[in-house]
A protein has these predicted regions:
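Rhodanese-like catalytic fold shared by cysteine-dependent sulfurtransferases
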Residues: 3-9, 17, 21-46, 51, ...
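Structural scaffold elements adjacent to functional motifs in cytosolic proteins
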Residues: 59-61
Length: 141
């Protein structure tokens, strides 16, 4: 009986050790995946404004042409959310560029940001809706 108890204890210890190694490896793999792949980033209007001032970014307005013409962030490129499908948008030729995406309220910008990531863009930041933009807007014409 003592021998069976020792055998059981050794087996349990081996099993615990092996499963611990497997869990540790899975965590490492997940961390590597996260650094290798592009990820969705939600930021505030203030953070987006700071990024615009301090680095080279492409500001992407995913609203309709009418909404864009009514007032948009200066230098924003119009790429309506509905136009983003399985093809890379012509207005966004560089998949390595840092994209700052916005719409009116934040719903379309999230959807568009996720579609752009799926198309292979690497650095996509959603800063929500223009209704939360405390800075100046420009109008065409």
């Amino acid at each position: 009986i003592m021998r069976q108890i020792l055998l059981f204890a050794a087996l349990a210890a081996s099993l615990a050790l092996l499963s611990g190694c497997a869990l540790s490896k899975a965590k490492e793999d997940k961390a590597e995946d996260m650094t290798d792949k592009a990820a969705y980033h939600k930021i505030s209007a203030e953070e987006a404004y700071e990024m615009m001032a301090s680095q080279e970014v492409v500001v992407v307005d995913v609203r309709t042409r009418e909404e864009y013409d009514g007032g948009h962030i200066e230098n924003a490129v119009l790429v309506p959310n509905e136009s983003i499908g399985s093809e890379m948008p012509e207005a966004l030729p560089d998949k390595e560029a840092t994209l700052l995406v916005y719409c009116r309220s934040g719903r379309r910008s999230k959807d568009a940001a996720q579609k752009l990531l799926a198309l292979g863009y690497q650095s996509v930041y959603d800063f929500g809706g223009v209704i939360d933009w405390p800075y100046e807007l420009v109008k065409e014409g």
